[in-house]
């Protein structure tokens, strides 16, 4: 298909090949660069992933532009954009739930929970900094968030701080609502 580009990245020291298939946008080199970065990031993080979560047992993995966000399948992910967070998260589903074979409908925490935990560690490794540091720096300049600032500074474990990112964004947006449960 002339509207799509297919990039292939062989990961050094591994038998894994990364395929990136995306819609070509003439004149938008930033689009090409963003999608090309997926293979480079995969090559950088795979040794860390395999050291911490086990060897990737398949010969290839494909990131395919399509769908409406991110949806993992065996050896492939449909993603709408080249977001590295989504790329890493969906790829880690190859370990949690696919290799473990858990029933993601019956035990969603084993699927999304372990994947999100692993994503936080891999993302932190890739960016080589605490993902919470950005919030700490932002909150230091916002006296209206004193309670949240104290929480960030003294309570949260830095090693797994990325798991709190979505919640902090929600709190800072002013759109937070009370939790509703059936109980």
Regions flagged by a language model, labelled:
Residues 53-56, 96, 100, 126-127:
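A broad structural signal for alpha-helix termini and local helix breaks/kinks
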Residues 1-88, 117, 165, 176-177:
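Hydrophobic helix-coil surface modules that form long, contiguous segments used
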Residues 112, 116-183:
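Acidic/His/Gly-enriched intrinsically disordered linker/tail segments
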Residues 59-66, 71, 101-120, 125:
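Post-HEXXH active-site segment of zinc metalloproteases
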Residues 49, 85-101, 112-116, 120:
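Active-site recognition of the HExxH zinc-binding catalytic motif
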Residues 78-80, 97-105:
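Short helix/strand-bridging catalytic loops that position acidic/His residues to coordinate divalent metals
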């Amino acid at each position: 298909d002339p509207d799509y580009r297919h990039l292939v990245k062989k990961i050094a020291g591994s038998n894994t090949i990364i395929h990136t298939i995306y819609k070509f946008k003439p004149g938008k080199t930033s689009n090409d660069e963003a999608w090309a970065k997926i293979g480079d990031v995969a090559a950088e993080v795979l040794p860390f992933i395999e050291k911490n979560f086990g060897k990737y047992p398949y010969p290839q993995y494909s990131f395919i532009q399509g769908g409406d966000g991110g949806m993992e399948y065996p050896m492939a992910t449909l993603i709408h954009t080249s977001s590295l967070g989504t790329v890493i998260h969906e790829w880690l589903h190859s370990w949690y739930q696919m290799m473990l074979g858990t029933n993601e409908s019956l035990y969603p925490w084993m699927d999304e929970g372990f994947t999100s935990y692993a994503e936080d560690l891999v993302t932190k490794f890739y960016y080589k900094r605490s993902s919470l540091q950005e919030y700490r720096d932002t909150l230091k300049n916002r006296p209206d968030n004193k309670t949240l600032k104290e929480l960030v500074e003294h309570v949260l474990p830095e090693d797994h701080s990325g798991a709190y990112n979505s919640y902090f964004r929600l709190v800072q947006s002013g759109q937070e609502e009370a939790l509703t449960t059936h109980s």
